[in-house]
Amino acid sequence: MKFAVIGNPISHSLSPVMHRANFNSLGLDDTYEALNIPIEDFHLIKEIISKKELDGFNITIPHKERIIPYLDHVDEQAINAGAVNTVLIKDDKWIGYNTDGIGYVKGLHSVYPDLENAYILILGAGGASKGIAYELAKFVKPKLTVANRTMARFESWNLNINQISLADAEKYLAEFDIVINTTPAGMAGNNESIINLKHLSPNTLMSDIVYIPYKTPILEEAERKGNHIYNGLDMFVYQGAESFKIWTNKDADINSMKTAVLQQLKGE
């Protein structure tokens, strides 16, 4: 079977390394490549994919929303998130999914087993936040709060959860067991701080969905305060495993995928 990841730029993507490690571990001869498709060429997506004879693909920035009009069917989770990151090609039909939310929550559950009883704060209200919020709401809806700079961003959310400003989030930070940053603040080359951690409880797990850098500024600050921290590496691995399951109906080798990504990040 043939798979790919599509984005622009895409040369930095660790998806090929991760998926190939999984294929090797499972004894599969499947292939996975990175395809750079600029925005101005995206209208050719059907033609490009057809020539590659792909069975499915991942789609990343900046095309997660742009792909939707080209799909024959969109899964409920992707509709809720307003974005697609996985496409299955079956009987010439393109079916879109979003595995980011379930990928993050599966990873979080592995390090925080008592998720159902946690009070959780999500920082940011973009596509990633939306997907994660919809998945977390299955566990902790009454205890889930999302904070954003502007409240207008929530107008498209069809989810009845607590919504507050970032200023209020800073004020009530001590009340949360888990704080999740879903904003681009802290990504490689971006040292912006999304929120002041002055009131962060020492028992709070501080999380960021970014994994490059391995520790974002907000995670470093929380760690200096003595908090446990959790980056986006597991989310990346688990969302990839969920994509593989959609394409093949097989379980992925999580350990081989995570090891391959860690080795790449360490330059091994």
Swiss-Prot record:
The active site is at residue 64. Pathway: Metabolic intermediate biosynthesis; chorismate biosynthesis; chorismate from D-erythrose 4-phosphate and phosphoenolpyruvate: step 4/7. Pfam families: SDH_C, Shikimate_DH, Shikimate_dh_N. Disulfide bonds: none annotated. It is an enzyme of class 1 (oxidoreductase). Its EC number is 1.1.1.25. One of its GO terms (molecular function) is shikimate 3-dehydrogenase (NADP+) activity. Keywords: Amino-acid biosynthesis, Aromatic amino acid biosynthesis, NADP, Oxidoreductase. NADP(+) binds at residues 76, 124-128, 148-153, 209, 232. GO terms for biological process: amino acid biosynthetic process; aromatic amino acid family biosynthetic process; chorismate biosynthetic process; shikimate metabolic process. InterPro entries: Aminoacid_DH-like_N_sf, NAD(P)-bd_dom_sf, SDH_C, Shikimate_DH, Shikimate_DH-bd_N, Shikimate_DH_fam, Shikm_DH/Glu-tRNA_Rdtase. GO terms for cellular component: cytosol. It catalyses: shikimate + NADP(+) = 3-dehydroshikimate + NADPH + H(+). Shikimate binds at residues 13-15, 60, 85, 100, 211. Homodimer. HAMAP family: Shikimate_DH_AroE. Involved in the biosynthesis of the chorismate, which leads to the biosynthesis of aromatic amino acids. Catalyzes the reversible NADPH linked reduction of 3-dehydroshikimate (DHSA) to yield shikimate (SA). Belongs to the shikimate dehydrogenase family. This is Shikimate dehydrogenase (NADP(+)).
